[in-house]
Each structure stands twice: as C-alpha cells, then as structure tokens.
Amino acid sequence: MIEIEKVREIVERVARDYGLEVVEVEFRGGGKARMLRITIDKPEGVTHDDCSHVSNEVSTILDVEDVVPGASYTLEVSSPGLDRKISKPADFERFTGSLVKVSTREPLDGNRHFEGRLESFADGKLTIDLNAVPQRGQKKQKGPKAPVVERKVEIALADVEKANLVPEI
C-alpha cells in the first residue's frame, strides 16, 4: 500500500528547497502502468530545470526509503499549465484578477457552472464578475447597446467543486 501522505511530505520538502509550491500529488493506474504525477508551481513560472531537480531528488528519496513498494512506476513532474486547477485559499488570493471557470457542488441561481473574472477572495468567499466573458446561451446584441447590468456571483469556497484558470490569449 502506498502511503500518499508520506509521498506528499517528501515532495513538499524537496519542492520547498527549490522555492516551489506543490499543486498536486496523485497516483494513477495499477500494476506496470502505475504513475506518480507531481505538479509544481512558482510565481515566475516553472522551468524544465525545476522539474528535473524535483524529479531526480524525489525519485532517489522514494527509492531509498522504499515508500513505493513493489512494481515499478513512472514519475512525472510538470507545471500546472495555463488552465491550472485552483483550490486552496492562497490560490484564489494569488489569482485574483484572472479569468476563472468554477463548478459548484449545488446550483446557485439555477447554475452550477460559472466563468468570469475572479474579482476578490475574502472571508472564504470568492466573487466572480460574470460580465468579463459571455455566458453560455448569451447572444451578442445587435443595434443599440442596452445598459450593462452588473452580474456577479459570490461563492463560498466550501461550495466549490472544481475551479480552473482560463487562459487569456
């Protein structure tokens, strides 16, 4: 049995030495297809060297301490990508001002999916400005523009099922 918490402790310790944040540690698959996927980040972006250092050190420690017993596994270390998952309070604080896509556990005003600009995060609640992007089913208006109605939604972090950044290209 793999002790995922023990693995996470090792990954956190190694990442901290390089000034990196651990976004996610997960095991996937079974048998010969087992994969340990580690996602790391830092404000100025993750480099290939960052991934290489973490991969080499974590691999050595896991092998020496025999934390992952049995068959072989593949170790993958990567950055979170442009559409990274955000879940911790620190993530929402860091990415205030960014475009986000959020799914809630229960419907709010008849919807579970919201996309817009993360306006703020305070007291465990995020505020999303829905005017930042056209919403599903919303059509572009032709002719004279109607007055813009501010559309915002406030969601408690505990109600967030999934949240990701939306790349702005």
Swiss-Prot record:
Matching entries from InterPro entries are given as:
Ribosome_maturation_RimP, RimP_C, RimP_C_sf, RimP_N, RimP_N_sf
**Pfam families this protein is in?**
DUF150_C (PF17384), RimP_N (PF02576)
Any one GO CC term of the record = cytosol
- The source's domain of life comes to Bacteria
GO biological process, any = ribosomal small subunit assembly
Q: Which CDD domains match?
A: YlxS_C
Q: Indicate yes or no for the key word Cytoplasm.
A: yes
Where in or outside the cell it occurs: the entry states:
Cytoplasm
The entry's keywords:
Cytoplasm, Ribosome biogenesis
The reply to whether Cytoplasm figures as a keyword in the UniProt entry is yes
What the protein does comes down to:
Required for maturation of 30S ribosomal subunits.
Similarity annotation: Belongs to the RimP family.
What is the protein's given name? Ribosome maturation factor RimP
Q: Which gene encodes it?
A: rimP
